[in-house]
Amino acid sequence: MLRSFSGAGKCKCRIPVSRQPVCGRSLRISSTLTPWNQSRRAASTVTSLDSFPNVGEKLHGFTVQEKKHVPELHLTAVRLKHDKTDADYLHVAREDKNNVFGIGFKTNPPDATGVPHILEHTTLCGSEKYPIRDPFFKMLPRSLSNFMNAFTSADHTTYPFATTNRQDFQNLLSVYLDATLHPLLKEEDFRQEGWRLGPEDPRSILTQGEQSKGNLQSEDVVFKGVVYNEMKGQISDANYLYYIKYRESICPSLNNSGGDPQYITDLTHQQLVDFSKRNYHPSNAKILTYGDMPLSVHLKQIGEVLDGFEKGQADTDVKLPLDLSRGPLNVTVPGPIDTFASEDKQYKTSTSWYMGDTTDVVETFSVGILSSLLLDGYGSPMYRALIEGGLGSSFTPNTGLDSSGRVPIFSVGLTGVSEADAPKVKSTIKRVFEESLSSGFNDEKVQGFLHQLELALRHKTANFGIGVMEKTLSSWFNGSNPMKELSWNEVIDEFKKKYEQGGYLESLMQKYLMNDNCLTFTMVGTPSYNKDLDDQEMVRKEKKLSELVERHGSVEQAVSALAEEELQLLKIQEEAQNADLSCLPSLRVEDISREKERKPVRESKMDDIDVVWREAPTNGLTYFQALNSFEELPDDLRLLLPLFNDCIMRLGTGDKTMEQWEDLIKLKTGGITTSTLHTSSPTELGKFREGLQFSGYALDNNIPDMLQILTTLVTETDFTSPHAPAMIQELLRMTTNGALDAVAGSGHRYALNAAAAGLSRSFWVQEQQSGLAQLQATANLLRDAESSPERLAELIDKLRLIQSFAISKGSGLRVRMVCEPSSASQNEIVLQKWLAGLPRNRSPTSPLDHTSVNSVANRVFYDLPYKVYYSGLAMQTVPFIDPSSAPLSVLSQLLTHKYLHPEIREKGGAYGAGASNGPIKGFFAFTSYRDPNPVNSLKVFQNSGIFARDRAWSDRELAEAKLGIFQGLDAPMSVDEEGARYFMSGVTHEMDQRWREQVLDVTAKDVNEVAQKFLVEGSRQSICLLGEKKDWADSDDWEVRKLSMNASGEPVIDPLSQDGAVASA
């Protein structure tokens, strides 16, 4: 998996968005040192410093270098080095049963062929101890892990997992260590995962006979490979493309680790093997373990593997960015057109400065605060000057402080900029610097950020260990001490000391930003960009074919040879599906408890409002959630709910600007959110609730303030202020700008939502709230608002109407509180008072109109400028309490691992494919992701029912499917999520317990029967594809649609009509 383009350790771009108000063989002990007495461990707690060996002591071939207790994070960290290989090791002990392992290697890419990324994939395709094909994916259903992945970052590659089961941990540890240190790296795996040339549909050769190979033409040959198609998908995301081209410009010595499709096809198998030998060695590794398992157990198992190696050469080369000390640099590159932006605003431009050295942990923390002060929130000076000032529509993806490398880089930029305004962006940024330096920074804002850090330390998350790994690895690989990264209080205290002396943040600004030593990077939307990529790919293909023709003598023989290679790969893939997997370790279904852990809640009534309480250890925090559901909401108002949520966190009230509200939110809360609500009934198919939900958390004593802030923002946001119309248009631009990139990142989900919209009104409503229909409606709103003051006024009137009933006392309101038992009584008093002050208004209603659902086409193709495809197929099934629900979930796991993965990913080259059962929503789904051949994938989807019905499922296969379900079902839960399932959907503990038992008791016969009933006989199916339209989309009854500011032909709701009528955009 390619690491997110923002990079580990990256302070992500702080774009003010809706619902976001703020923003690791034998025991060898030297006789000259005191052996570590393991018996001391048994009498101590997990994090007691005395329970760990002292500095200089040895254990299982490792020597302790540092150890430290970090009370604010309730952990103890021990840093060790493996004596024989010099492998670095960090153990983080914490009272957390969700244990984590990670091993990473420094992998500076030598070029842009993506060798680190392709190696990450092929490393997981078989090893010496586990010589089966693809043990990584084979382990997914043999484990109860709640996190299992691999990441290629800019300069290192990491293989992490997390699980609460200790035997599972040791199983996965064995597989991960052997995969990374003893990979097979077979050439056929390189061809499957990396790249190859071959006939687009080799299955046709099998169906038409061997003689058909001679009929293949050069046009039938295409580039294939999982990573190749993944990266084609990545560059379809203009945000990713902008970021990666920016990184190539500012740090040209650090090549594209993910791989540029233009260069991936230059990589050879031998180059991959050589890169692995150089880099995947313990001497070049960083290892991290986290959790409550004993350190000695880890060291024994890991040490036995590392002792099989001799000391090698570590890659300590830290790639540095360009030298900017001689003055400014400017780089301009072409990019794709954003069809959701105006034709005259196709520029993306940013300017970047260096901010010191990340090994200075305190200063890096301090410049992070400085970055937040300049960029966070609607009231930030950069937002006001750049976006509110009308120069662009949103921040560029590199905006913020990037501390993933040795040199922190601070960038500010805008998308949706006109050619004339592009030069003004930098000058405006510099003006903001000058004004901020002159006026200084408001102490209240700094205290607000520090308060947020205090709450972050108190907040108990389920994935804390993975967060520790992500926080430490990037800087560790670039020379920082990970122990310092974990010392939160020391860093904060040192910052406070410097800050209290006065002028500290301003001095950092003067030191790093008040100069012209910067790089300005600009991407210009070019109409021919995507066609140019296609042409370049064709040239590369012709060059490869010419080389093959020289070798084979003719085009026909060259293409026939490629077909033969493809058939050989297909044969290997087919054989792998029936391989003996007995060498792989596995948990058993018997390891799963039949009893669901009970998280008791209590219910009360206050003023006729249902309140659900969950009392649990929360470190002095109280979490609040309220749902306000609306019955039969008019369609035109529904489409405006997301925009209403945006407005609540943007417009401000009569007596306070949004900047003032943001400061108060940071000082008094951990954040408040508003969002749309859509939940399904577990007992009745198609029954659902929609509306708005509100949530937040704060220290117990700040809950009254938090509730007051929330209520005031919802009920008193000033839609009538002179600034409101411009702000609303600004919000619409932010949503539409980059909408295509948002879809590309989760294209399979958007395709599935659009497909499901034709199944029932519930799914149709969901699509209107959060799917492609919502994106197009938003674009239409922007178009109308910019062209017609009258339409903008109508929009504001409807937003004010929503405000009148958004949060009100009535049958639709429900509340959930999570707090310490000792805080419950005081919170009851506070809540009672808050409820008493709410207005009592009902939402307007309209008769249910099912024509909108019935008119949705069963086969929809969205013509979008992507180089790969995303597909979704949906069918309605049964509610959660139906006996068929559990076997349908087992069926989805079986199809994913035993049919769809080998057919669509391994053979078809898609990055991903799977089946899923939505037990609460009552639908069964198929999806593919970054898929080069969606037509074939749809055939596989449609053949799945017969495959599952006719297969004699083994006990082992059933057990694996059940383990896969319980990975999610029994995954650790953050304290604020406890009780949420019952509160949101009405799923009781007894319902969950019954479903759990039904899953555990599913038989092969049950699976065959639900496959026949729902997939073969089945009810109505709906399909949606996203991607570049090809000739085949003109047939097969596809309804072709577009998404853009000027889309036409698809039926959309007009949110500004009087009755929410369906119209043509």
Swiss-Prot record:
It comes from the Eukaryota. The keyword Mitochondrion applies. One of its GO terms (cellular component) is mitochondrial matrix. Residues 1-42 form a transit peptide. Degrades mitochondrial transit peptides after their cleavage in the intermembrane space or in the matrix, and presequence peptides; clearance of these peptides is required to keep the presequence processing machinery running. Preferentially cleaves the N-terminal side of paired basic amino acid residues. Also degrades other unstructured peptides. May function as an ATP-dependent peptidase as opposed to a metalloendopeptidase. Keywords: Hydrolase, Metal-binding, Metalloprotease, Mitochondrion, Protease, Transit peptide, Zinc. Its main location: mitochondrion. It is an enzyme of class 3 (hydrolase). Belongs to the peptidase M16 family. PreP subfamily. This is Presequence protease, mitochondrial. GO terms for biological process: mitochondrial protein processing; protein processing; proteolysis involved in protein catabolic process. The active site is at residues 120, 193. Zn(2+) binds at residues 117, 121, 230. It comes from Aspergillus fumigatus (strain ATCC MYA-4609 / CBS 101355 / FGSC A1100 / Af293) (Neosartorya fumigata). Its EC number is 3.4.24.-. InterPro entries: Metalloenz_LuxS/M16, Pept_M16_N, Peptidase_M16_C, Peptidase_M16C_assoc, PreP_C. Its cofactor is Zn(2+). Monomer and homodimer; homodimerization is induced by binding of the substrate. One of its GO terms (molecular function) is ATP-dependent peptidase activity. It is found in: Mitochondrion intermembrane space; Mitochondrion matrix. Binds 1 zinc ion per subunit. Pfam families: M16C_assoc, Peptidase_M16, Peptidase_M16_C, PreP_C.
